[in-house]
Amino acid sequence: MNLYSVARVISLSVLCAGFAFSQAAAGDLPQVGQEAPAVTLPSQDGSQVSLKEFRGKWVVLYFYPKDNTPGCTIEAHNFQRDLSKYQDKNAVILGVSVDSTESHQDFCTKQGLTFKLLADTEKKVVAEYGSLSDRGFASRNTFLIDPEGKIVKVWTGVKPSEHSEEVLAALSELQKN
């Protein structure tokens, strides 16, 4: 086997391993129709917030990488901009990252955010939702949870500038049925 063939075999092996790893990670996402995994985490004001508190409401549970970064700020601003539309649809927004409550408080103050941001510093909830990146941050994924606590829609790798509108459209469509 010549050097070119060896390099080619190694390259293909690495590609296949990477693909298999990414598929395994994607398989860890809770699926549509599943009961949403339990969430109890501290928010920016230090209070404990539990997903079960919101039974009877729609929940937009969105995971994002880091406070005060460009994409995360755009996404948060858009959710804040549309907050009254979500409230009109009996929906709450909960953001989750691995940042601390202090970081969330600073982010909310600087950006004028009034919805809850939850601090998963131990990365347990982020991992349970299949949203822990290999760099230790939350991946940009969102779960729409119905009033009975079931996951009805999942978005992965979202575009921050368009995402709130996508979620609102899906929520409107689901509420028609």
Specify the residue positions occupied by each region the protein language model found.
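Thiol-/selenol-based redox modules, centered on thioredoxin-like
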Residues: A138-N177
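A short beta-strand-turn-helix
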Residues: P30-G33, V39-V59
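Structural micro-motif
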Residues: L113-F115, S133-F143
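Structural microenvironment flanking redox-active thiols in thiol-disulfide oxidoreductases
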Residues: G71-Q111, E122-A127
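Short active-site neighborhood of thiol/selenol oxidoreductases, capturing the structured segment around
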Residues: L51-T73
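N-proximal helix/coil linker or "cap" segments that precede and/or mark the start of modular domains
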Residues: L3-V6, I10-A38
